[in-house]
Structure formats: structure tokens, C-alpha cells
Amino acid sequence: MRVLGVDPGLTRCGFGVVDGGGGRTVTPIAVDVVRTPADLELSSRLLRISEAAESWIDLHRPEVVAIERVFSQHNVRTAMGTAQAGGVVALAAARRGIPVCFHTPSEVKAAVTGSGSADKAQVTAMVTRILKLAAAPKPADAADALALAICHCWRAPMIERMARAEAAAAEQKRRYQARLAEVKKAGTR
């Protein structure tokens, strides 16, 4: 499974591609950070991020795009910019029919380091070790993008099993409600 991991941000947006093999085998394909100047208009910054995402998707052909979920930050303005950057990346993937999965920072940290409260240095060290890289990816946004891709490779089987279980439960509920409606209808005759 080829995964494009994206650590969204307006100033620095990390992109990392890995191929996931059997078990926990992951192979690095590419990593980079797209920067946008703070003095550009918001729309121009988002356009640059969108164009970069489209380029990465077209070049690397991922089967899924994994994006960091923004759930809260102390700085509302930063959180909004991060969410907007993630949104344009998700849109670029959706336009190409590629599924998008969002993972929280604690899910990514737990998957890669074993601790949901790991710091950036621990995440970078584990990404470097897992991918057998000669040097740590820099800046941290690059390492985070690779961590997102690794996280998705490792969590995808569980996510698929849960989706199947939820679909089966929904179908069972639908059949039960249909049967219940039949019984009620027969009882009113």
C-alpha cells in the first residue's frame, strides 16, 4: 500500500510517501516540505499547498492520503491555517478519487513510538529507525509526514476491520428493524 502522509501547515507543509509491505515493513519513497511565505495572501498560500499536493499525488500515485487531524491548539489562528491546509490537500485527493484518512497526533505518536505523548525528537528518531534512513528527516514537518504515512500503513488493517464490523452491525440492525416492523404490522391485522 502506498501512502502519502501530510503534516499540514501554512508556513511548512510536510509531504512523505512510503510503501507499506507485509507486517510492519515500510519503505521510504520521498519526503519534502513545501513552504509558503507569511507575507502572501491566504488564498495564494493555500493555492501553493494545493498545487504541491496535486503534484505529489500525480507523481507518486498513493492509494490513500493520511492527514494529521487538527483537533485543538492554543493558537486559534494557527489551528485554522493548519485545518485549511489539510482541507486543500484532502480536496486534491478527493478530486482524484483517492481516499483520505485523518489521524490525530497522539495516534501517530503511539503508532510510531509506542507512546501517545512522545515528543518531536522521539518521533523523528523512530521514523529514522523504522525507515532505516541514514539521517533524520528535517525539518520536523518532514518527519511528521513520514510518521503519518507509517501510522496509516500500520493502522489500515484495523481501520478496515472496524469498518466491516460497523457495516455488519448496521445491516443486522436494519434487518432487525425490518423484522420488527413486519411483526408489528402482522399484530395490527
Curated annotation (Swiss-Prot):
What terms describe the molecular function in GO for this protein?
crossover junction DNA endonuclease activity; DNA binding; magnesium ion binding
What reactions does this protein catalyze? Endonucleolytic cleavage at a junction such as a reciprocal single-stranded crossover between two homologous DNA duplexes (Holliday junction)
The Gene Ontology biological process terms listed for this entry are: DNA recombination; DNA repair
Question: Where does this protein hold Mg(2+) 2?
Answer: 68
Tell me the protein family, please: Belongs to the RuvC family.
GO terms for CC?
Answer: cytoplasm; Holliday junction resolvase complex
InterPro entries in the record: RNaseH-like_sf (IPR012337), RNaseH_sf (IPR036397), X-over_junc_endoDNase_Mg_BS (IPR020563), X-over_junc_endoDNase_RuvC (IPR002176)
State what protein this is by name.
Crossover junction endodeoxyribonuclease RuvC
| Compartment annotation | Cytoplasm
Checking Pfam families in the record gives: RuvC (PF02075)
Specify which residues bind Mg(2+) 1 according to the UniProt entry for this protein: 7, 141
Give the co-factor note.
Answer: Binds 2 Mg(2+) ion per subunit.
Q: Which cofactor does it need?
A: Mg(2+)
- Organism of provenance: Rhodococcus jostii (strain RHA1)
Q: In UniProt terms, what function does this protein have?
A: The RuvA-RuvB-RuvC complex processes Holliday junction (HJ) DNA during genetic recombination and DNA repair. Endonuclease that resolves HJ intermediates. Cleaves cruciform DNA by making single-stranded nicks across the HJ at symmetrical positions within the homologous arms, yielding a 5'-phosphate and a 3'-hydroxyl group; requires a central core of homology in the junction. The consensus cleavage sequence is 5'-(A/T)TT(C/G)-3'. Cleavage occurs on the 3'-side of the TT dinucleotide at the point of strand exchange.
